[in-house]
């Protein structure tokens, strides 16, 4: 089973295995700031329409998320551009004057998005998954953390069906 997430396509390419699916990688970054809030807050960026959230996290606040195209060879880190993007949106709605000095931690992750080659806008790419059987190799493309259990059941059923 090839369930390598963002590295699924690279693993296939390195082993000269063809697939009808392609993937785009999208990096999302989050900030944890020294701010205590009482309840979650959802904001919409006036610049690009993206949804940004603020979630209470003990005595801190989790802010997310960004969405940038990511190349497999690039480091998976929150960039200064992403920090500024999130802080500027929060500060445009709420008079907090948050700066980089308020950031106590940050993290980034890469989402593999499965698509056909005609899709240009990453916000329009489905967050669904695709499963492909290539002889005895099951390849999983895309997916979300929230649908992982369902995806696991589909793969399990595929194994049972194809194990003879």
What are the residue ranges of the model-derived segments?
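C-terminal catalytic lobe of FAD-dependent flavoproteins
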Residues: 8-63, 68-164
């Amino acid at each position: 089973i090839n369930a390598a997430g963002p590295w699924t396509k690279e693993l296939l390419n390195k082993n000269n295995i063809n697939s009808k699916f392609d993937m785009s990688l999208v990096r999302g970054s989050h900030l944890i700031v020294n701010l205590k809030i009482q309840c979650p807050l959802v904001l919409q960026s006036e610049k690009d329409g993206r949804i940004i959230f603020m979630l209470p996290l003990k005595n801190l606040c989790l802010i997310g998320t960004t969405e940038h195209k990511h190349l497999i060879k690039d480091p998976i880190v929150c960039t200064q551009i992403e920090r500024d993007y999130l802080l500027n949106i929060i500060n445009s709605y709420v008079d907090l004057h948050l700066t980089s000095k308020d950031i106590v931690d940050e993290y980034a992750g890469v989402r593999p998005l499965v698509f056909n080659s005609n899709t240009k806008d990453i916000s329009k790419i489905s967050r669904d998954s695709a499963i492909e059987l290539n002889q005895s190799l099951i390849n999983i493309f895309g997916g979300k953390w929230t649908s992982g259990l369902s995806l696991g059941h589909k793969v399990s059923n595929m194994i049972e069906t194809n194990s003879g």
